[in-house]
């Protein structure tokens, strides 16, 4: 699945840049009352990037598991008044623990950190997204 084709993601205006990163252009459609990027639009970009890094990290599980966002923490550092880019990351330890849990139990939790940066490279927002992922029982979906 291409995350930028998810209807909500399209509606928000999240795009992929030439470096393959997810970004949110600065335009009136995502502005708040202060004419900066709305908090919910920043959250949408960060959450989408967190899901995509898991999809890329575990591409062999696509169609075999259901990922659900279980918990999130977000901190807005400075107003975003330019295009912003998402920079997601997962620690090697978390990746290893996830692989072990999903293999042994058929379900696992994993946390993804995301930094949003403006065109000057300044941090506008940070977030941690905890995903619950469970294997699909045969015949359960599709």
Where are these regions (language model features)?
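Compact, glycine-rich, soluble single-domain proteins
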Residues: 39, 43-47, 51
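Short structured motifs
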Residues: 10-14, 70-76, 97-99
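N-terminal intrinsically disordered, cationic/polar leader segments
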Residues: 1, 5-9, 126
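Intrinsic-disorder/low-complexity, polar/charged segments enriched in Ser/Thr/Lys/Arg/Asp/Glu/Gln
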Residues: 19-23, 71, 83-85, 109-111, ...
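Hydrophobic beta-strand-centered segment that forms part of the acyl-chain substrate-binding groove
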Residues: 53-93
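Short, charged/polar surface micro-motifs in flexible loops or helix N-caps
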Residues: 27-31, 48-51, 92-95
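HotDog/MaoC-like acyl-thioester-processing domains
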Residues: 81, 91-142
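Catalytic strand-loop segment that frames the active site of acyl-thioester-processing enzymes
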Residues: 6-37, 56
